[in-house]
Amino acid sequence: VTGTAAMLISALFISSLRKYITEDTISNFMDNRYNKRVGYLYSYAYLLMGFIYIPIQLFTITTIFRTIMPNLSLTWACIIGLILAISYTVISGISGANYVSKISCILMYALMAVGLFIVLVKTSGIPNMKANLAPSYFTPFSMPTKTWFSWFLTTLVAFLTMQAAIQPSLIAKDDSNARRGIVFGALLNLPCGFICALLGMACMTMNLDVQGISSMAFATVINTYCPPLLTSAIFASIGLIVICTLAGQLLAIGTIFRQLLQPVYNKNNFSDKKTLTITRVITFVYGLLTIIPTFAVQQSALNQLVTVLVACVTGPMFFSLLAGMYWKQMNSTAASWSIISGIVTGVIWVVTGMSAAWHPVYIILPVSSVVGFIVCKLTSKNGIAEV
C-alpha cells in the first residue's frame, strides 16, 4: 500500500522531471545544473548502492532456483540469475524489460490468485488462521506508524531519485505516457502485498519449516500445497519479473558507467558500437562482482536492509534534485554539502545502531535539506564562490 501511494504521488512530479532532466541520467542533470563534482557524487553513490542492492534482488531469484533445484549452491544460483539478467538487458533493452515485466506481472497475479485459492482450501482458510494467529495479524494498523511511514517516505524518495526507477519515464514518448506508466505500475503493485501476506500467514498457521528465513515463506507454502505445474508457472513468472527488475537496475548502472566514461570515449574517438560494447562488458564485470557481498547479506533482514540502504543513498539526493528544479537560487556548494551531510548522517545513524529505533530516512531528509538550505543562503548572501 505504501509503495502504491508513493508511486502515485511521484507521478505528480513526472512533468517537472522530464522538463529538467533532458538527458538520460540524473547525474547528467546534477552535472549541468550544478557542476561535475555534484554529478560524480550522485554517480559514485549510486554505483556503491547497486553493489549491495543487486545482491538483495538476487536473493529472490536464488530462492526460486534453489526451491526448484535443492542441490544448487548459492554461488551458482547467483551466477545463473546474473547471466540471465545481463543477457536480457543486452537483448531487449529497457523498453523490452518494461513491457515484458508488465505482461509477466499480470500473468503472475492470475497464477498467484489461483495458488492462493488452493492454499486457503487446503489449509482451512481464514477461520483456521484466526484460530492460530494473533489478532494483530488481522488489524490493518497494527504495524507502528513510524515503520510504515518510513517505507512510504523511502519509496517516494527512491522513485524520484533512483536512476533505475526514473529511467523508463525519461524515455517515454511524452508526459502523458510516462504518467500513465507510473499509475499502471502502481496499481499492479497493490495486490501483491495482500496475496503474499495471506500466503505468509498460511505458512505460519501450518508451521511450515522456512529455516528461520521469512523470505522463504512464499516459496515454501506454494511448493507445499500447489500442484507441480502451477508451482512451476508461478515461480517462472516471478523469476521473469525479478530478472526484468534486475535488468532495469543493470541498465541504470550501465547508463551511469557510460556517462562517467564518456570523456574517455570522446577522447579516443570510439564509435557508438565500441562504446556500447565496452560499457556492457564493464557492467557485466560489475554485476559478477556483486556476488561477493551476497554472502554477507542476512536473508532474515532483507526487508529492513532494502529500505535502509535505499534511504541512505537516495535520501541525500532528494533536496538537491528538487531544489535544483524548483529553486533558482540553489547552487553547487549547497548541493554538495547537502548530499555529503545526508550520506554521512545516514552512515553514522546505521553504524551506531540508531536505525533499529528510528529509520534513517527520518534524520537524513531533514539534515540534508536544512544543510542545503542554510549553505545556499550563506553562499548567496556572502558571494562565496561555488565549489
Regions found by a protein language model. Give the residues of each.
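Membrane-embedded helix-loop-helix hairpins and adjacent transmembrane boundary segments
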Residues: V1-V387
